Amino acid sequence: MELHNLSSPSPSLSSSVLPPSFSPSPSSAPSAFTTVGGSSGGPCHPTSSSLVSAFLAPILALEFVLGLVGNSLALFIFCIHTRPWTSNTVFLVSLVAADFLLISNLPLRVDYYLLHETWRFGAAACKVNLFMLSTNRTASVVFLTAIALNRYLKVVQPHHVLSRASVGAAARVAGGLWVGILLLNGHLLLSTFSGPSCLSYRVGTKPSASLRWHQALYLLEFFLPLALILFAIVSIGLTIRNRGLGGQAGPQRAMRVLAMVVAVYTICFLPSIIFGMASMVAFWLSACRSLDLCTQLFHGSLAFTYLNSVLDPVLYCFSSPNFLHQSRALLGLTRGRQGPVSDESSYQPSRQWRYREASRKAEAIGKLKVQGEVSLEKEGSSQG
């Protein structure tokens, strides 16, 4: 996601600061930041920081190398050494595909920041670059949420039809999600870009419905999935406690997976949300110095956003025992030959929980029988 400057009568994030999901408006021309109403307070003119460019260029280069190595290893393991696939594997592979969208475009962003935010590859390449970056963010959020909800179904609703979905059904769900993700970000391929910069939004002098929609979508992409993930964590925790699943590997691993999902989610996407909203508040308050600082911090937070391609392989280790085992084997960290490790663990209630439930049912049935006998005795005595 890219952000850069604010400039319109309504509060909005600027092109160097706004994520790619904020589509450029063909009718709007680039302009400086203005105060609310663009009047008496005078315009705000935040400057591009060479310090931010100097920070982002090497960081993104390092993320490219680490992300390429980690995700190449992940793709190799999932495609060659993972048999059979499960619904969880389908969503993990989709996350790998999303990461490669980012990794393949990071070298162009590194070059962009090395040249102090000067794009030299043409408008068509700029459109594709911003489209891929935006698609990566949306896909990462969507499939992290899908992984969390898949774990929720396995633990909390083990007998639900969705919990027993086949690999083919999971693949169709993932395909449908990809179609929606591409449609949400396709506007970037139809937008017009000019000038030396390659930014996802050029703010004009008039606010547009498109801008407000994309701002709302940007926030919704963060808060709605986060709410679903937290709901899954709380539900799984309560289920583990109530059903006595604490001693089973599957439910415990599900909790670790969701904890890792939350960690990746907050580390990668929360900084841009915080500084983006701070930029909007500074814009509303016509605080030019604060606005300049917040937009530069937002721009720098792109390093965290792009970090998801590095952290996702760590998530795969938590989510798939087979992936962890195969990774250790390929890296020479295990001794001897071991059979494949199944990713499917038991999520059924423990023996103690089943015993308690059976006792409760037997007790309830006994009470019903006693009540029935009492009622029969009353009827007999009344007839006599």
UniProtKB/Swiss-Prot annotation:
Residues 1-21 are annotated as: Disordered. It is found in: Membrane. One of its GO terms (molecular function) is 5-oxo-6E,8Z,11Z,14Z-icosatetraenoic acid binding. The chain crosses the membrane at residues 59-79, 88-108, 130-152, 173-193, 216-236, 257-277, 298-318. PROSITE patterns: G_PROTEIN_RECEP_F1_1, G_PROTEIN_RECEP_F1_2. GO terms for cellular component: plasma membrane. It is a multi-pass membrane protein. PANTHER family: HYDROXYCARBOXYLIC ACID RECEPTOR 2, OXOEICOSANOID RECEPTOR 1. This is Oxoeicosanoid receptor 1. The lineage of its organism: Eukaryota, Metazoa, Chordata, Craniata, Vertebrata.
